[in-house]
Curated annotation (Swiss-Prot):
Matches recorded under PROSITE patterns: RIBOSOMAL_L27
GO CC terms, sorted: cytosolic large ribosomal subunit
SUPFAM superfamilies: Ribosomal L27 protein-like (SSF110324)
Organism: Lactobacillus helveticus (strain DPC 4571)
HAMAP family xrefs: Ribosomal_bL27
InterPro entries attached to this UniProt entry: Ribosomal_bL27, Ribosomal_bL27_CS
Name of this protein: Large ribosomal subunit protein bL27
């Protein structure tokens, strides 16, 4: 607004929403079966983004990198070299 050559400015900022104040729900990633646990074929063992843990024996990897059991057996988390980890499922009679 321009009155007599003076320009008037708002003395309060517009009442818009704040820039923060958003948060997305957690994705429920991580281990779904523990080391030494007995599971059935098809059971999800580990949900992940990217290949944080690699599939080992009798473990499949889904399109979203989820690891799941291919056979009934016992879960075993193992080291794969110095920096990598893998998870395997050993049939119950083989695990003993």
């Amino acid at each position: 607004m321009n009155i007599l050559g003076m320009k008037l400015f708002a003395h309060h900022k517009g009442g818009g929403s704040s820039a923060n104040g958003r948060n997305s729900a957690g994705r429920r990633l991580g281990a779904k079966a523990g080391d030494g646990q007995t599971i059935h074929a098809g059971t999800i063992i580990y949900r992940q983004r990217g290949t944080k843990i690699h599939p080992g024996k009798n473990v499949g990897q889904g399109g979203d990198d989820t690891l799941f059991a291919l056979v009934n057996g016992v879960v075993k988390f193992e080291r794969l070299g110095k920096y990598k980890k893998q998870v395997s499922v050993y049939p119950a009679e083989e695990a003993k």
